[in-house]
């Protein structure tokens, strides 16, 4: 059986070097229940992957009932559909795909295809933001960015020092500068900045989204493909010639490869 604690928060995680237990606190009665465990999972709701839209200089807007930022206006010729546009249920995503495809066809001068979105079960998505668990200092640190161990105290100190702009907070605290580039923690930091300054999240805004997200052609991932699939290599005009001549290719960084040597017959590296 799985016990569900409603109207409650994880107030503290106990353990040294590893998790040993959590303290769950009722939001209304403040009663504490301790549960032995070795792992704590957490969820921040659904956050659309808006990185490519942002890199294309597109703007974002905050949607209160989704508690997240979604694409607003596009500058370049890009269209967002489905979950990437804030349509988080299956029915919404399917309908979004249909409508945006019609728009795309129109923009490139093709006739609209008359079809209907597939039927799907009616779903509802709801979320209530909780930017910080309202507990006393005795419970220790409250982490916002799990990647870089950024806490609410770090954000408070940044604002106290006059770094209240979201770009300044990012650099003062290193929030959102881990290998996930803010994918897991940025919305928490923005929400906390807003809470501290009495602003809404749209007034706080976002930082510029960067890699690890980069465009990739559908041809790279569609259908049968030999060789690298997860991270396809880039090619120069002479790449095919090198491969045809039997070159042993070395990685050269940024998804490029260069010929290391051209073996003849059964030659190894030293012989070649």
Predicted regions and their residues:
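N- or domain-start disorder-to-order transition segments that initiate the globular core
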Residues: 231-272
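Residues forming the flavin
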Residues: 1-233
